[in-house]
């Protein structure tokens, strides 16, 4: 959580525990009370920006469920928060908010057109064009993790389909690939972890960094699938920066160098000219900067 001046200078930031009991019924009240306990009141506040881990109708502030917060049904987040706090609120998907934060204050600072790809348990993203987030008519713009890139459609996605970027480029996707190719790479340092079901993305990255053949194959294939997705996005939005964030991005240059190597040969040249693939800079602070930016753009 963070508090900003009207000029979007960060004054104060802090964290609170997320209480998902009682179907997440205390979450918004706890946010409100935390602001009050830090000494902030509605009279001091232009508005509050909220990033939530689920699909949002940006125009209405209604969240279409967020399993991680135990919100299993549609929830009018903006209206509920305004009612209990007497403060204006604006709500967006957390990946969108992080993308806007990185564009405004992080790796994309100074440029109006950026795309962020967040590689975690799943794959999220946000598209910023002319300094504004693109939401689409139903709020699904930026769902980069559900671009079809694995044309063999080997792995099931949580969305119900197969072949999504999320199935081959997230932490889960890395495990999918390691298990899929294990039979071709016996003797890898990942043998035991794969056989007992404990293999993780972190293990795969570390194996690749030490030259393990299976680890390197997985990293290279992940990079190839990300490059396919970025190539498609380039032809549509032509961003200055692709910003790579999330836990999987901690692989660093071993991943981004391979993404770059696969990206340019398959991309329309005018769409990749002067486009850079960079790492996110703000970490967890991207969300608060993006939320503050939303307030500035839409509530002032």
What residues fall within each predicted segment?
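Active-site glycine-centered loops adjacent to acidic/histidine catalytic or metal-binding residues
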Residues: 94, 120, 291
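ATP-binding/phosphotransfer module of carbohydrate and carboxylate kinases, centering on a glycine-rich
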Residues: 1-47, 56-62, 78-87, 101-111, ...
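Structural signature of FAD isoalloxazine-binding scaffolds in flavoprotein oxidoreductases
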Residues: 140-144
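A charged helix-plus-loop insertion that forms the helical arch/lid used to bind
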Residues: 61-74
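Gly/Thr-rich phosphate-binding beta-strand-loop-beta motif of the actin/hexokinase/Hsp70
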Residues: 1-11, 116-130
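General beta-strand structural signal in soluble alpha/beta enzymes
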Residues: 89-93
